[in-house]
């Protein structure tokens, strides 16, 4: 993400003062000869930043300084800010491409009535992953569509689920939960999957379409949370590290795909029109393009400072929940 900002700024002749991985006390830094940029690694690794000359309105600046962000053209500033999220999407596609080539893709096995049990009513009732569904309320089911229809018809009503477990027929009483705001039942089981090899062309296609689809699904999920249809579930830095470690155990291909989706999400998050985020800065640049007049740089800086404080507070609260509330 920050590399995108860095290379775009350099492309338009802006002077990059600092490229930092992490923030807080510096533990390593290097300034190449004849370079204006200090490259550093800081103690707290959860954030990174690029310091570009002229972005801080409280610093002394020369109106004739061609290396200053403040003196760059509107287009150069828009590209420099947008380059971060766009790099996230590009990096996401690269990671997903190689992840698919290495690890393949998961394909649902619709011919098997064996279930993979997720957290929900079926798990609570005692249904186990690997059970093969035989019948619902005495009615035989032979396809996943028949199972879906049988369960959907009984939201909030106890049903008798007959399953084959290691050659023995078991009967579990399951009460389907609601499917969002629909009057349909859901017991949270899904088809078993198997890994299928992916060729170069398919991997390339999927690597392009997967990031926007992932972001779209997350936007829909946020909408369901805001409408009260689902509970908010947020992972902070600690939770993300834990999930990354969990994905790593499944293999390098799956890990690369997960990191690709994470990169896409980071890019989308940074495009939100919120102060301190790239989307917030693009909002000010858009206003400048429409009004043909620069906003007061110091007022804009104060707004971004408030936004940054709010984001840091949010990250701290989510991190606390990751560590102590889970």
Where are these regions (language model features)?
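Hydrophobic membrane-targeting alpha-helices
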Residues: 94-102, 267, 271, 315-322
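Residue-level signature of catalytic and energy-coupling elements of molecular machines
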Residues: 1, 41, 84, 147, ...
